[in-house]
């Protein structure tokens, strides 16, 4: 039995939820999101909560039960408070600047990296910290992973782009012969 799937999702004020043909529609202001459950789970909106239940008793239905509940919860959280990821830049001459929808990175290459942010995602830079904000958890995480991928942290000096909460396991360098 899914421990995640059986928990109902409380619908916060200001968020409208409707179900039609196994498609959940979330609306807050002019922001609209959809989640297609493809008929794998039954979805009901009752007295301020979204309740999920498996369509059948097979393993596949029970797996989708918790997955779709988690995806719906991420949409509700994204519409109400949003998601953020923070990246830290370490290294001599490594810089970042947010210019509208473009994140400009100087990471020790011979060229500048201009990363175009997808719609619904914003980036801000404060000294060596890049903050990525958005209402879609998957997209925010994807953007953060792609920016980190330009220059992942190396284990000897710790130079590169890393998540703020990430801990780099350091290695000892070569020892010299005497």
Swiss-Prot record:
Biological processes, Gene Ontology terms: cytoplasmic translation
Subunit structure: Part of the 50S ribosomal subunit.
Bridged cysteine pairs (disulfide): none
Pfam families to which the protein is assigned, alphabetical: Ribosomal_L6
Physiological role: This protein binds to the 23S rRNA, and is important in its secondary structure. It is located near the subunit interface in the base of the L7/L12 stalk, and near the tRNA binding site of the peptidyltransferase center.
Name of this protein: Large ribosomal subunit protein uL6
Annotated keywords: Ribonucleoprotein, Ribosomal protein, RNA-binding, rRNA-binding
PANTHER family assigned to the protein according to its UniProt record, in alphabetical order: 60S/50S RIBOSOMAL PROTEIN L6/L9, LARGE RIBOSOMAL SUBUNIT PROTEIN UL6M
Family: Belongs to the universal ribosomal protein uL6 family.
Gene Ontology molecular function terms on file: rRNA binding; structural constituent of ribosome
Source superkingdom: Bacteria
Lineage: Bacteria, Pseudomonadati, Campylobacterota, Epsilonproteobacteria, Campylobacterales
PROSITE patterns: RIBOSOMAL_L6_1
One Gene Ontology cellular component annotation held by this UniProt entry: cytosolic large ribosomal subunit
Keyword Ribosomal protein assigned: yes
């Amino acid at each position: 039995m899914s421990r995640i799937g059986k928990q109902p999702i409380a619908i916060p004020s200001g968020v409208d939820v409707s179900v039609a043909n196994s498609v959940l529609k979330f609306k807050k202001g002019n922001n609209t999101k959809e989640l297609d459950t493809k008929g794998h789970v039954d979805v009901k909106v009752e007295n301020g909560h979204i309740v999920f239940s498996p369509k059948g008793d097979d393993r596949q239905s029970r797996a989708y039960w918790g997955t779709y509940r988690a995806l719906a919860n991420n949409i509700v959280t994204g519409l109400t408070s949003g998601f953020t990821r923070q990246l830290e830049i370490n290294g001599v001459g490594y810089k970042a600047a947010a210019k509208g929808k473009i994140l400009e990175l100087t990471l020790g290459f011979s060229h500048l990296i201009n990363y175009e942010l997808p719609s619904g995602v914003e980036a801000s830079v404060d000294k060596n910290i890049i903050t990525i904000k958005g209402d879609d958890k998957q997209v925010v995480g994807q953007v953060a992973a792609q920016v980190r991928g330009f220059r992942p942290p190396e284990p000897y000096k710790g130079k590169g782009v890393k998540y703020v909460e990430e801990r780099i396991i350091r290695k000892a360098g070569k020892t010299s012969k005497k």
